[in-house]
């Protein structure tokens, strides 16, 4: 069974289905196959197939509420979804901006000569990203460079 799950989780849609169920539960909402289908953008038949595999693997449990099937994560399913979210967040980082930031930080440790600090300040101004961690660090470094240029410790 684990080999089937490995293959399944190499598909983006399967991961998105699992994460969508997790997000519903985190928001205090109930997860239904039809709403998952709409949110993930996959046909209901595919969602149903994947949910069947998840249920056989004890990643989700399902029960009928009237004529409507509701799904929820098991403890193992929740753990898997959290791991995938961590991986997804890691992969959404701006690695190029982080590399540039490390280079700038290394250059900044070489003293506070204004001839060296002004290009660093310019690089910090030009570093654009959506990566929140990088944005925060850039702001900290801008402040530090400004203080160094103004003669503050």
Which functions belong to the PLM regions below?
Residues 12-15, 48, 78, 139:
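Non-catalytic, well-ordered alpha-helical scaffold segments
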Residues 21-25:
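Short helix-to-turn junction characteristic of helix-turn-helix DNA-binding domains
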Residues 41-56:
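Short amphipathic alpha-helical interaction segments
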Residues 84-151:
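Amphipathic alpha-helical dimerization/coiled-coil segments
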């Amino acid at each position: 069974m684990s080999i089937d799950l490995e293959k399944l989780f190499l598909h983006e849609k399967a991961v998105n289905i699992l994460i969508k169920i997790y997000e519903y539960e985190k928001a205090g909402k109930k997860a239904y196959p039809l709403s998952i289908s709409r949110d993930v953008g996959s046909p209901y038949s595919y969602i149903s197939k994947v949910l069947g595999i998840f249920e056989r693997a004890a990643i989700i449990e399902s029960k009928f509420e009237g004529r409507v099937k509701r799904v929820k994560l098991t403890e193992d399913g929740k753990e898997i979804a959290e791991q995938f979210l961590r991986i997804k967040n890691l992969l959404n980082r701006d690695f190029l901006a982080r590399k540039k930031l490390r280079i700038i930080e290394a250059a900044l440790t070489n003293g506070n000569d204004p001839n060296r600090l002004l290009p660093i300040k310019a690089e910090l101004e030009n570093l654009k990203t959506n990566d929140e961690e990088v944005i925060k660090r850039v702001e900290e470094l801008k402040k530090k460079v400004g203080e160094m240029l103004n003669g503050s410790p």
